[in-house]
Amino acid sequence: MEATPVYMDLDTFTVSLKPDAHDSDRILYIGLTLKVASAETKALLEKHLPETRSHLLVLFSQQTAAELTGDQAKALLAAKTKDAVNASLPGQHKPMVTNVLFNAFILR
């Protein structure tokens, strides 16, 4: 029998993107849900949420609009997000976040 999935919704992020040659003043509005390994992982994430959100804000603000265009770009951002969240958890040697799901993605 497969374990019941555990999800954690994060508050929406609104960040200014890094300007590139063609665009400046671009904004990313992004909503995420994390699929985590267990209820214990969710509790650990909630405990360290300010640090995790800070890491994600930095990650998102380092992107350009061109880097976020297309399905492959979104898949790459999801992978980077998963890596950043897992790296922000203290003392963890295995991935605790197993998937990143976008529930809002607006590039302005």
Regions found by a protein language model. Give the residues of each.
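Flexible, low-complexity charged segments
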Residues: 1-108
